A protein has these predicted regions:
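A conserved acidic beta->alpha catalytic loop
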Residues: 1-8, 54-55
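Acceptor/aglycone-binding surface of glycosyltransferases and processive sugar-polymer synthases
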Residues: 12-13, 19-27, 31-41, 46, ...
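Short, conserved catalytic or interaction motifs in soluble domains
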Residues: 27, 52-54, 152
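Beta-strand scaffold of nucleotide-dependent catalytic cores
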Residues: 137, 149-150
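Histidine/lysine/aspartate-rich catalytic loop segments that bind and position anionic ligands
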Residues: 145-147, 153
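Alpha-helical membrane-interface segments at transmembrane helix boundaries
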Residues: 174, 178-181
């Protein structure tokens, strides 16, 4: 779904390196579909999920690996700040977590993000779920694997702008709450 030169660069990398693969969609099907497709094509013992816009700092990966080495099935990040976001978006995000944790049986830490390292066992459990409308943050919590949380300070995007509209985020929040209530 990306409209920049990402696909061209991925094709070049895949041609040069046998261990690089990519998935290309005919259009933008959304973050959840992209994550599910990515997870379903993984083969390794460990899987890292992170945003490509560098809002999830790759430099955290070695520290997060320590959680996996300690025996956790998941090492995940959560924001300590919401730098780069409007106050209204931050307020609605905080409200979402409070409502979701109050109204559902799935408890998600405040400011949890999708940036995480997961074991193959956890990924396989996620892939067995048949949800059509997926809400990954909830699914990651619902499958019940031990998770170690790593705080990080949110950073502003280095390039581009978010494609999430307020309406899209609101629908995503409603889907997240109704999926687990």
């Amino acid at each position: 779904g990306s409209r920049d030169s990402t696909l061209t660069k991925m094709k070049e990398l895949a041609a040069a390196h046998d261990n690089v693969r990519y998935i290309s969609f005919s259009r933008n099907f959304g973050k959840e579909a992209a994550m599910y497709a990515g997870l379903s094509h993984t083969t390794g013992d460990l899987v890292i999920v992170m945003d490509a816009d560098l809002q999830h700092p790759p430099a955290m990966i070695p520290e997060m690996m320590k959680g996996i080495e300690e025996g956790y099935d998941c090492a995940a990040a959560r924001r300590t700040t919401r730098a780069g976001e409007s106050k209204i978006r931050s307020a609605f995000s905080n409200l979402f977590y409070r409502l979701s944790n109050h109204m559902t049986d799935v408890k998600m830490p405040q400011a949890a993000v999708d940036f995480r390292i997961m074991t193959r066992q956890m990924v396989d459990s996620i892939l067995k779920l048949s949800e059509v409308e997926r809400f990954s943050k909830g699914i990651f919590a619902w499958v019940g694997f031990d998770t170690k949380w790593y705080p990080y300070e949110n950073v502003e995007r280095t390039m581009g702008t978010t494609k999430w509209s307020f309406r899209g985020l609101f629908k995503y929040a409603i889907d997240g709450i109704t999926s687990f209530s």
